[in-house]
């Protein structure tokens, strides 16, 4: 998300055009490096509810978010939006994107927890190390009872392994690119061949 885990009253002042651009570029680089997606499609969520054409709920989309998306697009980053979070997750639009940039932490985690109740994985982007975690809460009452579901933990381990392999591959390619070979183009038209 654009903001970290901060009090909700501080969210509005933390959302700036520069912050959106910086976080989205970092997110895009992480997707490219750790998931080997060459040109990721990133959805940018709106801050305010839908049907806000008259700015009655706020003008952040018009003044901050849309200009940031336009600047990202001018830099060649596939950023789309802003999308109202309720429609975006409720209608399944999230399946059409490689990543989602939320404006604040709970805007992304609340629908994620609703969609993936048992096997969700937390992936922290932009770190020099790979960090994954099972998106579960400790349930000490079932410790040692052979009742816990380890699926989320297993998915977190597999994601960490895959991301590490992808990052290693990406870094090797970036360090040792193939040299570009330029050949002069020959004119193979009929006129040249029979002259």
Regions from the PLM with identified roles:
Residues 1-60, 66-195:
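Anion-binding alpha/beta catalytic cores of soluble intermediary-metabolism enzymes, centered on
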